[in-house]
Amino acid sequence: MKRIAVLTSGGDAPGMNAAIRAVVRQAISEGMEVFGIYDGYAGMVAGEIHPLDAASVGDIISRGGTFLHSARYPEFAQLEGQLKGIEQLKKHGIEGVVVIGGDGSYHGAMRLTEHGFPAIGLPGTIDNDIVGTDFTIGFDTAVTTAMDAIDKIRDTSSSHRRTFVIEVMGRNAGDIALWAGIATGADEIIIPEAGFKMEDIVASIKAGYECGKKHNIIVLAEGVMSAAEFGQKLKEAGDISDLRVTELGHIQRGGSPTPRDRVLASRMGAHAVKLLKEGIGGVAVGIRNEKMVENPILGTAEEGALFSLTAEGKIVVNNPHEADIELSSLNKSLS
């Protein structure tokens, strides 16, 4: 394989630029030409495919977002869109593609492989909801950003003896909420993978204030409900008068990636190029126990249960991290 391309698709994530940089420089070191596909699958169909060299990716390892830009393009799920994209790949002599994104992006990579273009998927999403990898590119930065914000909110919460409901991203996965909540000593962590009773939360809040607590921090995963809705239900369930809600929003998707995300993205990008050089396609790169692994995209792109609840009341984290966390610890003070 002499000529490959790289694209980013779906929601952006810190560390995508580091992955692109690794793909480009590893490919050059292997004697391959590299092209960047701008604006994801939409750019592929439009022919926005341009050569990249080592200088093209200089000084981007520390930048958030993706300099190739990203776009959602549902039309690529249809055969017509796929054939248009493949026509452009052939026109530019592309023999393999590295796709950086989430599960929707993986479906596109799977279709390319089925049409004879080996594609490698790299897990680029802050949600950490990709099966087959302990961590995704961008997750660590998103958790760090959320942690910093929650720490600041705790300061003002303590000043006024307030209860704060802080909504974090994650789509249908509770990983950001779980990690950021534990890291900040949140009083409650509400995630889609575990049930909760509003009356228990009300009782916990009141008991805390009676014991002299100066604040109450509730970290809420967006996959459960919005902070506004949760706050309203909390007020209806009990007399919680001094309550504020905050949605951290897209701040979690931006910013300079953490060292962990930069290194993870670099390792994954280089590994993807090595696979393409061997003619391997249709797989997604992951990290398990700090080692690079490959999984069939077909299984990786399909949504799987990240958590399961045992009869003993424990959350077993099937993916992305190996751990048992008692359900009770999520519904009582961790501070």
UniProtKB/Swiss-Prot annotation:
Activity control note: Allosterically activated by ADP and other diphosphonucleosides, and allosterically inhibited by phosphoenolpyruvate.
InterPro entries xref list: ATP_PFK, ATP_PFK_prok-type, PFKA_ATP_prok, Phosphofructokinase_CS, Phosphofructokinase_dom, PKF_sf
Enzyme Commission number(s) of this protein: 2.7.1.11
GO cellular component: 6-phosphofructokinase complex
Keywords from the UniProt entry: Allosteric enzyme, ATP-binding, Cytoplasm, Glycolysis, Kinase, Magnesium, Metal-binding, Nucleotide-binding, Transferase
Pathway: Carbohydrate degradation; glycolysis; D-glyceraldehyde 3-phosphate and glycerone phosphate from D-glucose: step 3/4
Binding site for Mg(2+): D103
Known cofactor(s): Mg(2+)
Pfam families associated with the record: PFK
GO terms (BP aspect): canonical glycolysis; fructose 1,6-bisphosphate metabolic process; fructose 6-phosphate metabolic process
Function: Catalyzes the phosphorylation of D-fructose 6-phosphate to fructose 1,6-bisphosphate by ATP, the first committing step of glycolysis.
Protein name as it appears in the record: ATP-dependent 6-phosphofructokinase
Species this chain originates from: Streptococcus pneumoniae serotype 2 (strain D39 / NCTC 7466)
